[in-house]
């Protein structure tokens, strides 16, 4: 794969954020590129890394033909981890998903783990290892996207994955999903740190307007979230920046070493919260001993602009408003946010009709890092008590 080399970067403490890199050519063999402004990641190295990367697909009541396309596009070497929060009664959409996965496995013999987010055996495993952050007042796992991603991470850790990538299940273009996973691998191969995150910036996010396709560059929420994440950095460096373009990147990946030390917020705030936490904790040289290896190696964040556009399910204006509120709430409540920044966020949310005059954004609910969870014990409990766990080739 040929990509623009990461020339410009923003350094914030131990955190390096690379400017967005465009994919120039999807598939290459030779390692020799005479131009220093281009990075070449040979096909063989990408395919070697894919075998060490689990791809996590959280889903909830998605269209089955979209799920089918997404699964078929994930490179065969990658273990697939599906965490579903779909209905199990009236109608039982989860059963339909299970039937689809079984058929997909029979055709492909892909490596797959599947589980339902509301599985009582899964909740029991969290309870017994003392990790109750993910549970609701009834002792069941909450319904948020962040919770599903965290379950997927633990399953990935249990099977020994060194890298984890996330893809949404509602993508209309299967070929785009195939590219996303290879983009993740390319990002990891460019990194010099074991604590690396790769976030994707869609080349276009097309919308149907007046009967034709309009290839929009920015999503509605992303534009605003990125603006405030950049302000968060700028107000501490005193230099204006536009480096961050992937604040709401649902399609992102990280090394397991980074994933297991990050706390995760719930629901749709999870992607911007990852960035906010990394900047808060590793953007200053404080309490270095707790994470000495992280500070020694540094955290690298790569942003890659995809070759493919991103078509996904339109979930309506209310979904957009909820995403915007939860995304900006993570920045509003950050320890790095200044009074001036908070005032601007409040004004924006009120101007969009999302908050009333005297309301504040809700404080994000945060779940502890998974590093201290005894993974073998947790997995043994899941396997012994789950009613929905399916394992194929894993």
Swiss-Prot record:
Molecular functions per Gene Ontology: mannosyl-3-phosphoglycerate synthase activity
Alphabetized Pfam families for the sequence: Osmo_MPGsynth (PF09488)
Protein name per its UniProtKB record: Mannosyl-3-phosphoglycerate synthase
Family affiliation: Belongs to the glycosyltransferase 2 family.
Chief place where the protein resides: cytoplasm
Species for this entry: Pyrococcus horikoshii (strain ATCC 700860 / DSM 12428 / JCM 9974 / NBRC 100139 / OT-3)
Hydrolase keyword on record: no
Function, in words: Transfers a mannosyl group from GDP-mannose to phosphoglycerate to form mannosyl-3-phosphoglycerate (MPG). The enzyme is absolutely specific for GDP-mannose and 3-phosphoglycerate, and transfers the mannosyl group with retention of configuration.
């Amino acid at each position: 794969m040929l990509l623009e080399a990461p020339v410009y970067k923003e350094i914030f403490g131990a955190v390096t954020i690379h400017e967005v890199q465009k994919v120039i050519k999807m598939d290459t063999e030779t390692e020799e590129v005479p131009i220093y402004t281009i990075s070449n990641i040979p096909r063989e190295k990408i395919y070697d890394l894919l075998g060490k990367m689990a791809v996590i697909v959280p889903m909830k009541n998605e269209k089955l033909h979209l799920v089918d396309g997404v699964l078929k596009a994930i490179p065969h070497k990658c273990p697939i981890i599906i965490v579903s929060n779909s209905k199990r009664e009236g109608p039982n959409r989860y059963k339909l998903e299970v039937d689809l996965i079984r058929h997909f496995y029979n055709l492909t013999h892909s490596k797959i783990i599947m589980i339902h987010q509301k599985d009582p055996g899964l909740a029991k495993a969290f309870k017994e290892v003392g990790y109750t952050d993910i549970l609701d007042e009834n002792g069941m796992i909450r319904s948020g996207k962040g919770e599903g991603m965290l379950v997927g991470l633990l399953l990935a850790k249990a099977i020994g994955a060194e890298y984890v990538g996330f893809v949404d299940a509602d993508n209309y273009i299967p070929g785009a999903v195939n590219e996303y996973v290879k983009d993740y691998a390319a990002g990891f191969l460019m990194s010099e740190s074991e604590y690396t995150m790769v976030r994707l910036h869609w080349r276009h996010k097309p919308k149907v307007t007046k009967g034709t396709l309009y290839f929009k560059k920015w999503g509605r929420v992303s534009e605003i979230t990125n603006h405030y994440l950049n302000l968060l950095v700028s107000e501490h460096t005193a230099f204006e920046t536009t480096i961050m373009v992937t604040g709401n990147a649902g399609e992102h990946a990280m090394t397991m070493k980074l994933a297991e030390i990050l706390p995760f917020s719930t629901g749709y705030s999870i992607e911007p919260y990852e960035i906010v936490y990394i900047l808060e904790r590793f953007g200053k040289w404080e309490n270095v001993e707790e994470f000495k290896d992280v500070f020694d190696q540094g955290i690298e964040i790569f942003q890659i602009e995809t070759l493919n556009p991103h078509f996904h399910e339109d979930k309506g204006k209310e979904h957009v408003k909820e995403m915007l509120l939860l995304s900006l709430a993570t920045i509003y409540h950050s320890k790095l946010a200044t009074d001036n920044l908070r005032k601007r966020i409040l004004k924006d949310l009120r101007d969009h009709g999302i908050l009333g005059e005297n309301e504040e954004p809700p404080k994000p609910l945060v779940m502890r890092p998974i590093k201290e969870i005894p993974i073998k014990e947790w997995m043994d409990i899941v396997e012994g008590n789950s009613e929905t766990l399916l394992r194929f080739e894993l």
